Amino acid sequence: MYDDIFNWLKEHGITEVECILPDITGVARGKIIPKDKFISEPDMRLPEAVLLQTVTGEYPQSSLLDETDADMELKPDQSTLRFVPWAQDPTASLIFDCFSPDGLPVETAPRNVLKRILKLYENMGLEPIVAPEMEFYLISPNPDPDVPLQPPIGRTGRSEFGRRSYAVDAVNEFDPLFEEIYDYCHEQNLEVDTLIHEIGAAQMEINFLHGNALDLADQVFLFKRTVRESAFHHKMYATFMAKPMEGEPGSAMHIHQSLNNVENGNNAFSSDDGTPSELFFHFIGGLQKYLPQTMPFFAPYVNSFRRLTRFTAAPTNVEWGYDNRTVGLRVPRAKAKGRRIENRLAGVDVNPYLAIACSLACGYLGIKEQLQPRAPLSSNAYSLPYQFPTTLEESIERLRQCEPIHEILGQRFVEMYIAVKEQEVSEYFRVISPWERKYLLLHV
């Protein structure tokens, strides 16, 4: 069954295998196993609770958790076999899928959530195509979380200051790092494309080539590890926080999405005459209706909401428009075969499997409900009222009330996701911030 994997490991002289799976926050969990042991026992077991840790490593207080902490059956996906280029010894990585002892997919596994949505589209004769854009900051090493972050020192010996958007020389400040990142990505078959300098100090963006939604989610999952590891090697940090620094723009994961007709390979967002199809408009209608109700998948942490402010290239609404970067749903200029919708809501701190799954789920509901979008906006959308929940707590409550999303993503999964988010909010509010000590200690 796994002969191709075993042969690849032997041919490449692999000594260790990283057996990994994404948890509900997008962290890589799993085991590192000697190659010979992996070949003798390629399947693996881990408790489901591994998937359900908060970002701090705690567990939610939920009756939905298995009291016996029973194991899942884990099976490697051969298509995810890759070389780990930064490892000291020859190492491979494999992403595993999660099954219950009776062989059914574990509904709380993020990869299975995305597969569930892709199956719905498959039943309609459609294949979702996505292309994520990943923004992130480079920062100087900072082991003390109470100290504000600073940009790293580049080749000129200076920290970046001011605004350097699209400046090629500003990217070249860190040329050895980016050469290594691209080399690492190439060795892992991560199909990265354009590199640009974003608005913030040492804020960068790397785009992916478009492709299958599950494959791209896997690539983003591995890309985050890759960039962080390369940054460590060059004595700096790379952060995928949505809003890491005060006074600087936040970082997003924009999701370009379209639907291909499986039968003929054509873009289902375009009619035969090249005009936008009804499916295209229904998809936008679904995003407009359901994105505000599913914010925890696109802004999963308290910090995420600091990004969603006016005039910072982040959306404050779910209006749509042609080539309009002030709206939440932008339709880039493209020929009929390249027609797509850019969901600009997601922060780069999201779990890529869940953000892509939920974005596609919202569009799917729009198609099923035959929803029509509001008229496209050609003016500045920042002048419009804020259309999202303003806090994580409010967004959790709106998700709790959204039954169509519970049904399409899986009732138990959504309830467990809410439990994890509520636990994280509780943990956050136990921490007294420097702002509180500064202004309240002696003034109230």
Where are these regions (language model features)?
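Short, hydrophobic beta-strand segments
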Residues: 94-100, 204-210, 257
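C-terminal accessory/tail domains of diverse enzymes
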Residues: 2-12, 22-27, 41, 49-51, ...
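Acidic/histidine-rich catalytic neighborhood
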Residues: 251-273
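ATP/Mg2+-dependent ligation/transfer catalytic cores
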Residues: 1-194, 216, 355, 384-444
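Short, conserved phosphate-binding/catalytic loop or strand-edge motifs used
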Residues: 134, 198-206
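Accessory "access/gating" subregions that flank catalytic or transport cores
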Residues: 165, 170-174, 178-192, 206-213, ...
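Short, solvent-exposed loop/turn elements at beta->coil junctions and helix N-caps
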Residues: 242-247
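Short beta-strand elements
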Residues: 147-156, 253-261, 318-320, 327-333
